[in-house]
């Protein structure tokens, strides 16, 4: 199974069984996935905004949490563990109703006990809106029979790639050593 298909199946599980995701970010779409990286987008609607009419920080925090889980799914974990740490840094306004917020999340480290992810968000003007990090306890998630971790190994080892070489916003892909 491809990373994209597997990530979308895990996302569908979130949407049908969780309490938060279907209420707040149900319209989020997974646009691309490969082992260790997921791209997604969310059309901004009223429930995503604050009283100023712009994207609410809680929406972005929810997306940091959920996208971190999806980054782990891109490595083959169906049950994606539980959060131990989550951080969001807000840099620019995310947009208003009708705008599109785009995100890219990367699995920085995929261990047997803990996994680490980082995400960045871009607004409709291609400005960076926020960046986040998410740490998850995954020791029990490795036991799920639905995992396909052997099928979804990244082409580049995490320790060989830097943030700059693994991101693809704007469609540019960089290879280590270029």
Question: What residues fall within each predicted segment?
Answer:
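Terminal targeting signals and extreme-terminal segments of soluble enzymes
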Residues: 1-178
């Amino acid at each position: 199974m491809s990373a994209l298909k597997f990530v979308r199946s895990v996302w569908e599980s979130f949407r049908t069984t969780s309490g938060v995701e279907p209420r707040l970010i149900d319209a989020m779409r997974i646009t691309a996935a490969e082992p260790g990286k997921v791209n997604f987008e969310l059309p901004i609607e009223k429930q995503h905004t604050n009283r100023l009419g712009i994207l609410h920080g809680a929406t972005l925090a929810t997306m940091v949490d959920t996208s971190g889980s999806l980054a782990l799914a891109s490595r083959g974990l169906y049950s994606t563990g539980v959060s131990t740490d989550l951080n969001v840094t807000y840099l620019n306004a995310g947009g208003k109703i009708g705008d599109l917020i785009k995100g890219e999340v990367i699995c920085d480290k995929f261990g047997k006990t803990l996994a680490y992810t980082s995400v960045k968000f871009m607004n409709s003007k291609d400005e960076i809106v926020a960046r986040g990090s998410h740490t998850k306890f995954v020791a029990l998630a490795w036991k799920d029979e639905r995992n396909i971790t052997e099928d979804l190994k990244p082409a580049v080892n995490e320790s060989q790639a830097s943030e700059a070489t693994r991101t693809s916003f704007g469609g540019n892909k960089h290879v280590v050593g270029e």
